[in-house]
Structures are given as structure tokens and as C-alpha cells.
Amino acid sequence: MTSWTEFAQQAPELAAFGQARFQTGVAYLATVRADGGPRVHPVTPIIGQQLFLFMEPTSPKGKDLQRDGRYTLHCAVEDSGGGGGEFYVRGRATLTGDPALREQAVRAASYVPEEQYILFVLTVEFAFMNQYVAGGRNSRRWQAGE
């Protein structure tokens, strides 16, 4: 399991691109429902030493992640031409009650998380980016352990 910091050390350009894309606003979190089907949710990722997500304790996405921690997180794309590019990561999410991690996430957040929000730490197992340029695209990928 790879933290965001470890990912950034191994693939600094890819991590910097991903951080920039996630900071532009809403991203989309895919989880696995209890019946095995996919579920997609808008979220605001937080990047500090770890990749974090806060959410309401009653959120369906939180229930999904507590039952099956697999996730994929994809940045919003600005337009049908690909805008600033695409970035996504996949890995495992773990619910944490650690006060030090919560403090870290609150400090890194672009908003003030509500006290009742639960916190997930997301590992990075795979990352991929596409930048669309005149005449083609620039793609990169990274996988933990490669």
C-alpha cells in the first residue's frame, strides 16, 4: 500500500499533475455497492502527506468504502476536448479515527470539514494521466511495485 507521499517520491511529475487537477474542484469517486454494482460520487479530495476524503457518516460512499475499500478517483474534466487533462488513481480506502491524521487532513483541506465527518485515508496503487495537446496526447502511468 502506497501513501500519496511515497507515490510523489516515485513519480513526482505525475503526482504534481494529479494534485493540480484535483485542486481544481470536484472529483468523482467510484466505489462498489453491496450488490457489486458501481457507484459514482462527487467528492473533494485532500492531498497532504496522504490522500484523504472527508464525508458524512451516513454517506452511501462511506458505507461502500467501509465494506469494500476499493476505489477509483477521477478528476473533473473541463470540457469535451479534455481541458487541462485527465488524472485518476485507484487503490484502497481505510476509515481512520486517528486524531493526528485528522489534524493533518484538516490543515491540508481547502474547506473546513464538519466535526461529524468521518475520514478515509486512500492508498495509491495505480495512477494515470492524459494531457491533450495539438495532434495527440501525452499519457503517463504508474503502478506500485513496478
Where are these regions (language model features)?
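A generic structural signal for nonpolar/aromatic side chains embedded in well-ordered alpha-helices
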Residues: 21, 65, 105-107
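Short, conserved active-site entrance elements at the starts or edges of catalytic domains
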Residues: 2-35
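Short, solvent-exposed coil/turn segments
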Residues: 22, 38-40, 82, 115
